């Protein structure tokens, strides 16, 4: 991919980020109006209360962290269906090693994260070296991680007994917002923001980030340009393991108890956040801030549906429709862009032909 093409795509990323942002603001505004008119008329709408907005960020932080790892994997042209069960494994292994095996907390956390990196690296090696479809390998990984996690804890849940409360407890004194709700600001929110900034910086400003885009856009062209495509793909899965491990620890801090369902179906939310945030399923396109907004939008939709007292089943319907809508919208936008480029190229060719004819005359 040429530098000009890369710059053009990055310009479209910014436009895509604005679109997600405006959809987020529009959704919050609609829920707020409905709440003011029909649910709680005459009172401050909880949807826009500082406490509720912070709760949305709290709810999506772990998913958003994991989505940053998925961002790099998908930009490089891959996908990972195993992140949900890998999350359960990391949570269960951490809790089991700390509570039952008496590991120091730091050792338990580091060991669990390193295992996540190892497992993801193994899948990345198979995908990059043996040319196996990521969908198949990560689907197998999902099943394998589930089985290993169940074996470790014998299908039981394990409580952390508040050992991770330092990541969960609010860093500010109790303060009530206009809706009378207490504002909670746990530290793992800042972990989410910090990882987003790091991934954004790596993708935007480093040679490694440019290689990820190049591999995702056209692996063959990247190879001919001297990029080690296999190592780039392998490294994105290894980094994904690291980031998923961190996200799993943050999630464990929030829920306190590790169980096999801790990460169940988490991959749906992670992939949805990435796709809504502008990551192309075909690779080579997207950025971290778009995914950041996509994760928050997913959380806002779930939160808004709870405020409207809709059944939880409708949340799955909404998530599925959102993913389908995001993919269709991206495909339509890409087709329109390709058509405009083709028309511009044809116009340029005609103008050059007319100029050559005048010179000959």
Report residues per predicted region.
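Cytosolic-side transmembrane-helix boundaries in multi-pass membrane proteins
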Residues: 1-33, 37, 217, 224-231, ...
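Hydrophobic core segments of alpha-helical transmembrane domains in multi-pass membrane transport
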Residues: 21-36, 70, 113, 146-147, ...
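Structural signal for alpha-helical transmembrane segments and their membrane-water exit/capping regions
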Residues: 26-45, 76, 152, 200-207
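Single transmembrane alpha-helix segments in multi-pass membrane proteins
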Residues: 29-36, 49-101, 126-132, 274, ...
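Alpha-helical transmembrane segments within multi-pass membrane transporters and channels
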Residues: 102-143, 293
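Helix-loop-helix "hairpin" substructures at the membrane interface of multi-pass membrane proteins
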Residues: 103-109, 118-123, 127, 175-258
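Transmembrane alpha-helical segments in multi-pass inner-membrane proteins
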Residues: 244, 254-320
């Amino acid at each position: 991919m040429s530098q000009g093409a890369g710059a053009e795509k990055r310009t479209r990323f910014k436009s895509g980020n604005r679109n997600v942002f405006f959809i987020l603001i529009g959704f919050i505004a609609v829920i707020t109006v409905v709440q003011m008119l029909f649910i709680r008329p005459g009172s401050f709408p909880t949807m826009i209360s500082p406490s509720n907005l912070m709760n949305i960020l709290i709810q999506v932080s772990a998913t958003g962290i994991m989505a940053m790892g998925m961002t790099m994997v998908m930009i490089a042209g891959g996908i990972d269906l195993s992140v949900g069960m890998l999350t359960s494994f990391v949570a269960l292994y951490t809790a089991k090693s700390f509570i039952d095996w008496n590991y120091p907390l730091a050792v338990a956390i580091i060991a669990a994260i390193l295992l996540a990196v190892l497992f993801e690296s193994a899948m990345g090696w198979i995908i990059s070296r043996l040319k196996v479809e990521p969908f198949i390998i990560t689907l197998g990984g999902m099943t394998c991680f589930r089985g290993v996690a169940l074996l470790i804890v014998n299908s039981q849940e394990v409580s952390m007994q508040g050992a991770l409360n330092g990541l969960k407890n609010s860093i500010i004194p109790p303060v009530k917002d206009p809706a009378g709700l207490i504002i909670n600001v746990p530290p793992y929110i800042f972990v989410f923001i910090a990882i987003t900034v790091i991934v954004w910086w790596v993708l935007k400003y480093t040679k490694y980030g440019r290689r990820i885009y190049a591999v995702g856009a056209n692996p063959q062209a990247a190879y001919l340009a001297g990029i080690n495509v296999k190592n780039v793909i392998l490294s994105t899965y290894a980094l994904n393991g690291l980031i998923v491990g961190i996200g799993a620890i943050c999630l464990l801090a929030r829920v306190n108890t590790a169980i096999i369902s801790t990460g169940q179906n988490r991959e749906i939310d992670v992939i949805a956040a990435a796709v809504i945030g502008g990551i192309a399923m075909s690779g080579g396109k997207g950025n971290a801030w778009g995914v950041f907004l996509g994760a928050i939008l997913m959380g806002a939709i779930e939160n808004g549906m709870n405020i409207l007292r809709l059944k939880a089943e409708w949340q799955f319907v909404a998530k599925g429709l959102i993913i389908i809508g995001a993919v269709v919208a991206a495909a339509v936008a890409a087709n329109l862009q390709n058509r405009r480029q083709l028309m511009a190229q044809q116009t340029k060719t005609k103008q050059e032909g007319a100029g050559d004819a005048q010179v000959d005359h």
